[in-house]
């Protein structure tokens, strides 16, 4: 795709309905090649703007498209955000690894009683606060800069709904076993903080972690936490991120919606 990026840019800018004034290309680090070995620059930007505003399903968001993670906003979670919204009415919600707070905004859109957003990045939390205020100015929103593992270990609070959407734990094959331990640990911590009858929406975006591996990690987490858990939905990347049948690794985003007793 990088070889034809100029053609892609020309085509996108030529679609009047999109109203684009610029195209930003970001090189995603590979599981195989290191950047210096690939001969491809880390990023190429056409007249970059740092923060852009846009809407998704009628909700307003801001994203840092040059300094943020990946493209600055995770469009692949669009459908899953709506599903979290649908279980949030009247609930106290924790959005862990919240990044810029898209799940938090959707939780309020679904009628959440309160939302707590936690991320280790201060710049992400700053945008998270702005995104919530842009849609629900007076909403009871608590945003904290913290390591999510430590936060879940230390807080006394419990929640009706918890969203776990961490960054990739395994970017290389040698990190898979450590990643599996990480998924088990963070999900066990979350399960201990969910009220009986609550919901956990948990994700892995590591393409090296299969759906079966992720499900096994969650099963072990449930045993460790001493919670009885039922799968109510299998979550995937949005249809705007189709997967070639010849490239199963493209089915990278996997998630579970769990009912926790």
Q: How would you describe each model-predicted region?
A:
Residues 90-99:
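Conserved class I S-adenosyl-L-methionine
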